[in-house]
Amino acid sequence: MSRVFKKTCSNGKLSIYLGKRDFVDHVDMVEPIDGVVLVDPEYLKGRKMFVMLTCAFRYGHDDLDVIGLTFRKDLYVQVQQVVPAESSSPRGSLTVLQERLLHKLGDNAYPFTLQMVVNLPCSVTLQPGPDDTGKACGVDFEVKSFCAENLEEKVSKRDSVRLVIRKIQFAPLEPGPGPWARLCRRFLLSAQPLLLQAWMDKEVNYHGQPISVNVSINNSTNKVIKKIKISVDQITDVVLYSLDKYTKTVFVQEFTETIAANSTFSKSFAVTPLLADNCHKQGLALDGKLKQGDTNLASSTILRPGVDKELLGILVSYKVRVNLMVSCEGILGDLTASEVGVELPLILMHPKPSNEAASSEDIVIEEFAQQEPSGESQEALAAEGNEGS
């Protein structure tokens, strides 16, 4: 059974069909966007029909536009003329889903295929505050279709149909070794140093799964370690127009472990940063949203050699911090306590899902609410039910 996403413009004359809304970046290529557009022939009336792919960086909200504060930059725009098809446009073979849709929808349906370039960012959304309205800040992708005499003609929202998609990356199948860090710290009146080592078993960790952080301590000093604090920070770099950097702690936990002077310690700790524990932190980077509640903490940005960082708009990275609370022995020891620690880079991503091809010729269409002329409506999915091919 094949799942198809459908959206119709508010005048009901133009509909767009896509087989999926998540398109995978495989580093050397990105999955093509193949779909079908259905148009009322009376509405077309000899005009041209276009399909447009836009990757945009938004830093600001629609309601600020009246005072000129909204910041939006189109990072990439690709336009394909679908009707009449241009002879210069590459014409590849139709996908199985396109063939089924064309057979089902009839002569007024037209296929299209868009191919992203490889140096575009993945979809990222900055978590809005409780009073924020309009589109969230971040990087988003949109497929739009409209009819016009030419590309210079101004087309109203009522006469166009737009569907948000996502560009995503999955973790590499063969990740490298886990990160490792070491700290040697000497203290006054202690002949020997404190040695702290921390490492992770894997280079890449998955969203929602515990991260194993291994800690080894050789305390050859006269100090006492009262507790171990492990935290995970998300670092978001807005690189398109400025050097803004935001650091948000997405996990922190203190472990009461007493490590006496002239002793050793070794233990593995499990930490799990989750969006559910950070849902009220404004400015937190999330994987791009398609509908309410369908996302998670943003995946780490994987940079390709030679890519212009400004084209990526927003860069996301993570680090794990392991801190020791070190104090002197005795009642007044806590008054002179100090922290020492190390940092580990963390790559947080989704595992690559198994490819399960649809074997049935049935099509299930999930239709979105028609978009309102005044702007984007809430994209609530309503299953249209099982549609035969």
Curated annotation (Swiss-Prot):
Main subcellular location of this protein, as a coarse class: other
Region (Disordered) residue spans: 369-389
Cellular compartment(s): Photoreceptor inner segment; Cell projection, Cilium, Photoreceptor outer segment
Signal peptide feature range: none
Keyword Iron: no
Keywords tagged on the record: Cell projection, Disulfide bond, Sensory transduction, Vision
Cellular component GO terms held in the UniProt record: photoreceptor inner segment; photoreceptor outer segment
Tissues of expression: Expressed in cone photoreceptors in the retina (at protein level).
A Pfam family it matches: Arrestin_C
An annotated GO BP: signal transduction
GO MF entries: G protein-coupled receptor binding
KW Disulfide bond (keyword) present: yes
Gene3D superfamilies for this protein: 2.60.40.640, 2.60.40.840
Subunit note: Homodimer; disulfide-linked in response to retinal illumination. Interacts with CXCR4; the interaction is dependent on the C-terminal phosphorylation of CXCR4 and modulates the calcium ion mobilization activity of CXCR4. Interacts with GPR84.
PANTHER family per UniProt: ARRESTIN (PTHR11792), ARRESTIN-C (PTHR11792:SF19)
Family indicated by similarity: Belongs to the arrestin family.
Job of this protein: May play a role in an as yet undefined retina-specific signal transduction. Could bind to photoactivated-phosphorylated red/green opsins.
Protein name: Arrestin-C
Organism, as annotated: Bos taurus
Gene giving rise to this polypeptide: ARR3
